[in-house]
Structure formats: C-alpha cells, structure tokens
C-alpha cells in the first residue's frame, strides 16, 4: 500500500470510529488496530488523533459547505431557502456519519472545524440574500446577519432532530421549515417591539 493509500485508509477508519464513538471515545490504538497497522503509523501520517480528526472534520465541512453553496445559485429568495434546506437534509441523509462527526463537540484545543463555525460560514452566504431582501422591503440591512444566523440555526437544529426522528419525509420537513421561516419573514416588523414587562 502506498503512503497516500495508507493515509486514506486511516482517514476512512478514523472517520467511521469518530462517527460511532466521537472524538473522546476513539483512541489511536483503536484506529491503528482497525487499520491493521501499528500506532506509530498513525502518528507518522497525522501526528496523533487530533491531526486525523482535524482532516476528517475539514473534509466534512468542505463537503457540506459545497452542497449548500451550490444550492444558492440564484432564483427567488424563497426558492433559495428551499434549496439550502434540501441541501442540508440531503447531506444528512447521504452522509450520516459525516454529519454526526460535525455536530459532536470537537476537542477543546481545536479552534476551527466546529459545527458552529460551519453554520456561521453558511449564514454569511444567506446574509447577502437577506440583505438584498431587507433593502427592497425598507428594513435595516445591518440586521441581516442576525436573521441569517437565526434561519440557518433553525434549519441546522431541525436537521439534527430529523436525523434521529427520520420522519416526516425530507420534502415535508423542508416545506415546514420554509413555511415557518418565509412566512415569518413576510410578517416581519421593520422595528419590532417587546410586549412584555421586561425591556432589557
């Protein structure tokens, strides 16, 4: 086996174990044993479990981000919202192990490669769409980042729930997500106010 093939094998083995057991529940010993190599081979290729995990997470993030970005290629804003929601649920359905890896807590020492940072990247793209929509409606476009985070977070958390529930069907989940977010946006007040007693 070439060095490149061995590296890919270790990535495949590590990915499967991280999806099943998480970062903390996986050891270098297990990775090496499942790959049929000694521990030093894992260290040689990745420097340790953290390095292997970082590469696995980076690949999954790129895959999901590419799917969502590819869905945001033009059209009516509501259609873009539908396509983005479908892209996330498609990824969850097609790459369940990858999604499980992304939503698990990453090691404390790792500053990048978290699900939160991925959601933030996606929200930045949605922000541009919302900013244009806000300008057309006379709303403050500076608030688009807040709404983008809320929308993307709603879809992502629903995706986590759907992964476990596996019902209703994907198209129905997307329809309900879009219904809530789109109709919520269509009734948006330019200057929302609180109606309760608490004001700060």
Predicted regions located by residue number:
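N-terminal intrinsically disordered/low-complexity leader segments
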Residues: 1-5, 141, 189-200
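Helix-turn-helix
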Residues: 9, 13, 17-51, 55
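Solvent-exposed, amphipathic alpha-helical segments
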Residues: 13-20, 63, 67-71, 154-162
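Short coil/turn segments at alpha/beta junctions that flank glycine-rich nucleotide-binding fingerprints
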Residues: 20-24, 95, 137
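Alpha-helical DNA-contacting segments of helix-turn-helix folds
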Residues: 51-60, 67, 118
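Hydrophobic alpha-helical connector segments
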Residues: 55, 69-94, 148-151, 174
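Amphipathic alpha-helical packing segments from all-alpha helical-bundle domains
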Residues: 62-65, 111-135, 145-150, 172-175, ...
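Amphipathic alpha-helical segments used for helix-helix packing
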Residues: 91-113, 127-131, 157-164
């Amino acid at each position: 086996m070439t060095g490149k093939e061995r590296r890919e094998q270790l990535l495949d083995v590590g990915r499967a174990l991280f999806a099943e057991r998480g970062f903390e529940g996986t050891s270098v010993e297990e990775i090496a044993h499942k790959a049929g190599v000694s521990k030093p081979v894992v260290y040689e290729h990745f420097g340790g479990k953290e390095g292997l995990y970082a590469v696995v997470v980076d690949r999954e993030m790129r895959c999901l981000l590419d799917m969502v970005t590819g869905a945001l290629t033009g059209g009516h804003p509501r259609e873009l919202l539908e396509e983005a929601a479908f892209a996330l649920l498609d990824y969850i359905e097609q790459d369940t192990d990858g999604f499980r890896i992304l939503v698990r807590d990453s090691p404390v020492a790792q500053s990048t490669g978290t699900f939160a940072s991925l959601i933030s990247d996606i929200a930045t793209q949605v922000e541009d769409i919302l900013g244009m929509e806000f300008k057309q409606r006379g709303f403050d476009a500076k608030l688009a980042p807040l709404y983008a985070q809320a929308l993307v977070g709603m879809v992502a958390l629903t995706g986590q729930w759907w992964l476990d529930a596996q019902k209703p069907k994907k198209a129905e989940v997307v329809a309900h997500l879009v219904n809530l977010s789109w109709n919520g946006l269509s009734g948006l007040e330019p200057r929302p106010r609180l109606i309760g007693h608490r004001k700060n």
